[in-house]
Amino acid sequence: MNTMIKAGIIGASGYTGGELLRLLVSHPDVSLELATSRSLAGKPVASTHRHLEGFLDLKYENPGLEEIRERCDLVFLAVPHGTGMNYVPELLDGSTKVIDLSADYRLDIPVFEKIYGIKHSDPRNAVYGLVELHPEAAREYFVANPGCFPTGAILSAAPLAAAGLIDIAVFDSKTGISGAGISPTETSHYPNLAENIVPYKLTAHRHRAEIVQELTRLDGNLRNISFTPHVIPTIRGISTTAHLFTKEPLSTEDVRGIYEEFYRDKPFVRLPGGVPSLTAVRGSNFCDIGFEADKENNRVVVLSAIDNLVKGASGQAIQNMNLMFGLVETRGLWTPATAP
């Protein structure tokens, strides 16, 4: 690009905001213009994100939306669910582009209101920013970044769903503690989680709605979709096991052919063979996928691994940003994981 993208982050003090800062500070086409926090205004950003010491000298601000719009070409919303809709209308009242990392615009409005129990105040549409399924994000000014669990689950099943081969889909996902956010909860409190696995919201997790929405867009006849999450005692990563019961028996070779074709030219989806590892994707924007066919039971077991803060959140947002500004989608993101 001839000019730098002037980017701002609203809600920069949490894990997602911090990961946006970490990735953007070294992006060759981005100038970080502002990072907002109402409670930390005036304090150095590096005072809360210590790993960024020496990499940026920004201080937290709390400017009005008109000023943010005037200063930024792009704004990332890293705010709680139910608050993104309070920012979007004014931010989009001009040429500023917006990527919303909250859930506010991911779902159809009636579904959102039912799942989140919040009355939606801004019924505009956004592209669901899972680039591997929605390349049209490149033409948009407003993108709804997908949730972390749905990213791993949808990518694990999309090729078979698009082929119309799935009868029943059952997703079992395990996430690191950072998925619960920066404020401790009962499930993320160390004494409760150490040497433990904590399942929660066994049949009614709100991310199921995104999984259903996207897989049924690929196959309108697919209706039997289940999802159960667990928290595990690691900091980053989501490991998803998808039990995909198929309409006809498939071999592992059949599955590999379908997945290789579907993800051809999708640089952030890798099919390395074997069982995907969280350590192989930690700190990166990759989604690693493995699979094995259980031909006797018309079942395909698909495994996916992502970093919940990168491909599951901030990295995926930057992948969308790259396309929205005419850049190669790997720009600033093509780095290996931090294994071990």
UniProtKB/Swiss-Prot annotation:
Location in the cell: Cytoplasm
Stored PROSITE patterns: ARGC (PS01224)
GO biological process: L-arginine biosynthetic process
KW Oxidoreductase (keyword) present: yes
Pfam families named in the record: Semialdhyde_dh, Semialdhyde_dhC_1
Signal in keyword set: no
Protein name: N-acetyl-gamma-glutamyl-phosphate reductase
Organism: Methanosarcina mazei (strain ATCC BAA-159 / DSM 3647 / Goe1 / Go1 / JCM 11833 / OCM 88) (Methanosarcina frisia)
